[in-house]
């Protein structure tokens, strides 16, 4: 909808005060990676980018710049039909950055990248944001978003479920717990009224609803030995799963 490829049921989307199609040279305003494989298979990476630069009035020097930025200089003259998924993804990112836009929209940018490539895109996204650009990323990899994103928008079945920071979503998810290891697990469970205790092993409890100091004081007051008392922070993935539990379109049967 931001790029005008689909119409909202109500409202409108603008970039710098105009719809995407209303800009004379859209690539210089917003760069987007949606489907990296939507390329002419007979063109080289270099000529693909040159064609985009020509149609949008972008200086040809930007082509060499983004090829170097994405690590594609050595394959710039090869036809894209021979590119791997990861190479195609890098070319899509190069095209998104070709116009040096202030806004970047990337859909699943790490798709097909090897671990080195994932680290590269993570660093790239942060550097783009540090330059003052707006970077919008759509991803299902919550572990990666936890390392990259500053702000999250979560949508489920067309409804806005969250519009908050990563830290705030995790903090309010209610998933934080405390791992307790004690030979008196059954006795401690009885004493921790108001908390949810899940037995992970005969001597191990995962306690939700109480902080570690309070659990420690309760155990000390009743002479219960503790071998471990470790706060377990909720993960972004768990917070996301809890938030979207009722908004999943397709649910498989338990294995």
Enumerate the predicted regions with their spans:
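ABC transporter nucleotide-binding domain
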Residues: 121-210
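A short linear hydrophobic-aromatic micro-motif
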Residues: 71, 195-198, 225-230
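A generic structural signal for secondary-structure junctions
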Residues: 54-57, 171-174, 193, 220, ...
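ABC transporter nucleotide-binding domains
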Residues: 1-137, 142-150, 154-156
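Structural motif corresponding to alpha-helix initiation and N-cap regions
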Residues: 60, 77, 88, 163, ...
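C-terminal coupling/interaction segments
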Residues: 211-255
């Amino acid at each position: 909808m931001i790029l005008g490829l689909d119409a909202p049921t109500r409202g409108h989307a603008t970039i710098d005060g105009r719809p995407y199609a209303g800009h004379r040279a859209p690539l210089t305003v917003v760069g987007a990676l949606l489907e990296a494989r939507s390329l002419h298979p007979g063109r080289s990476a270099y000529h693909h980018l040159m064609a985009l630069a020509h149609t949008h009035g972008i200086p040809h020097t930007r082509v060499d710049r983004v090829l170097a930025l994405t690590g594609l200089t050595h394959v710039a003259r090869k036809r894209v039909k021979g590119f791997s998924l990861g190479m195609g993804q890098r070319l899509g990112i190069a095209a998104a950055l070709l116009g040096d836009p202030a806004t970047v929209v990337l859909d699943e940018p790490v798709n097909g990248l090897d671990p080195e490539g994932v680290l590269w895109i993570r660093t790239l996204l942060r550097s783009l944001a540090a330059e003052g650009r707006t970077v919008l990323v759509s991803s299902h990899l919550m572990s990666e978003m936890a390392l990259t994103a500053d702000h999250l928008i979560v949508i489920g079945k067309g409804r806005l479920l969250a519009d908050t920071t990563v830290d705030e979503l995790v903090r309010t998810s209610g998933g934080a717990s405390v791992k307790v290891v004690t030979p008196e697990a059954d006795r401690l469970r009885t004493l921790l009224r108001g908390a949810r205790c899940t037995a992970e092993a005969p001597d191990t409890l995962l306690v939700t609803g109480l902080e570690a100091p309070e659990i420690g004081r309760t155990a000390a007051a009743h002479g219960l030995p503790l071998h471990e008392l470790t706060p377990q922070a909720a993960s972004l993935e768990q917070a996301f799963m809890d938030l979207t539990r009722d908004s999943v379109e397709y649910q498989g049967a338990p294995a």
